[in-house]
């Protein structure tokens, strides 16, 4: 009987090892956010503290993950996504690229939803591999009765482990919907269905526990790629919100504080009051980069005589693009090329 039991155990271990060898390898980079949030009450979905739970604990809470991929976790940070900075982004990019250059088949980043689109867009521009990077979050903390994080995480790992995800760039997955990092944005402060790409739509959805893509892999038209492996810092770039009666004083203050470039969230197609336009024209003539985006949330901002148009990038993504562009050039026309809006 003992011999039979031992044989069964050995057989089970061999089967498990064989399965592990055939599964894809996925590394989860934990940064905190609501998905790792904790509240005093299970009914509290707003008064919680983000970035309280370790990434290893998040993985352990979803035992089905082991059927999808060989998973390990790295705690990059554990904070609210509003605290994610250039130092964290650069470190995460270097880690992801080093892993993807080896035997890691996909990367998952757990992240707070408030700035998910910025991190995802950054990773999309700096990924040096065709292997997928998937950014995932949650709208309810891990302690909530109906927390969305566990299913979102399982979907994210499944997506990162899928061969069909190769060549699609960085993606964002929440609420069963797969979005391209280049276009996806958070559109509601409370809705579970918060991420949208108004003009471009989604890449796919989850059905029956598997990703279903609407299109074959395709590259965003004109999307640049940046190698950040040797960078230790990123240029300081700030955003100003346009409004009636706005003056140029904030622009002057930002330049004095050390900003190397400015993105203006203008009204409509990047419109700003005359006093601000005159200031931007003056800066443009001096070679200082100002990018005009739109506060509308969607649409295209065309090339301007007095400034760089952001194309189809919203202000927060235009800031990421300008930061990375400035690591390669100071020429305004070359910078405009990264936005696809050369004059």
Explain the meaning of each model-derived region.
Residues 110-131, 272-281:
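Short Gly/Thr/Asp-enriched flexible loops that form oxyanion-binding sites at enzyme active sites
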Residues 101-116, 257-269:
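Short acidic, glycine-rich surface-loop motifs adjacent to enzyme active sites
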Residues 269-343:
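C-terminal non-catalytic interaction/assembly regions of soluble proteins
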């Amino acid at each position: 009987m003992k011999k039979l039991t031992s044989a069964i155990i050995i057989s089970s271990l061999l089967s498990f090892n064989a399965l592990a060898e055939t599964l894809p390898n996925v590394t989860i980079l934990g940064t905190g956010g609501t998905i790792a949030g904790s509240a005093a009450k299970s009914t509290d979905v707003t008064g919680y503290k983000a970035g309280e739970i370790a990434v290893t604990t998040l993985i352990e809470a979803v035992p089905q993950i082991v059927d999808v991929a060989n998973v390990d976790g790295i705690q990059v940070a554990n904070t609210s996504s509003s605290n994610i900075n250039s130092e964290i982004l650069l470190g995460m990019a270097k880690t992801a690229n080093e892993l993807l250059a080896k035997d890691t088949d996909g990367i998952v980043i757990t992240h707070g939803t408030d700035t998910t689109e910025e991190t995802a867009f950054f990773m999309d521009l700096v990924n040096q591999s065709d292997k997928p990077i998937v950014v995932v979050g949650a709208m309810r903390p891990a302690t909530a009765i109906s927390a969305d994080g566990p299913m979102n995480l399982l979907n994210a790992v499944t997506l990162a482990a899928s061969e069909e995800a190769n060549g699609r760039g960085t993606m964002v997955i929440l609420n069963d919907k797969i979005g391209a990092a280049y276009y996806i944005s958070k559109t509601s402060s409370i809705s579970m269905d918060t991420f949208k790409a108004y003009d471009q739509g989604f890449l796919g959805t989850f059905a029956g526990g598997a990703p279903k893509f609407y299109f074959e892999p395709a590259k965003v038209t004109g999307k640049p790629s940046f190698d950040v492996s040797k960078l230790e810092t990123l240029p300081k770039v700030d955003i100003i919100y346009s409004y009636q009666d706005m003056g140029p004083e904030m622009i002057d203050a930002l330049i004095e504080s050390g900003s190397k470039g400015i993105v203006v969230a203008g009204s409509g197609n990047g419109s700003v009051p005359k006093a601000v336009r005159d200031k931007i024209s003056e800066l443009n003539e001096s070679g200082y980069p100002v990018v005009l985006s739109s506060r509308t949330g969607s649409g295209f901002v065309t090339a301007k005589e007095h400034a760089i148009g952001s194309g189809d990038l919203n202000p927060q993504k235009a800031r990421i693009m300008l930061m990375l562009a400035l690591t390669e050039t100071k020429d305004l026309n070359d910078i405009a090329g990264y936005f696809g809006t050369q004059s």
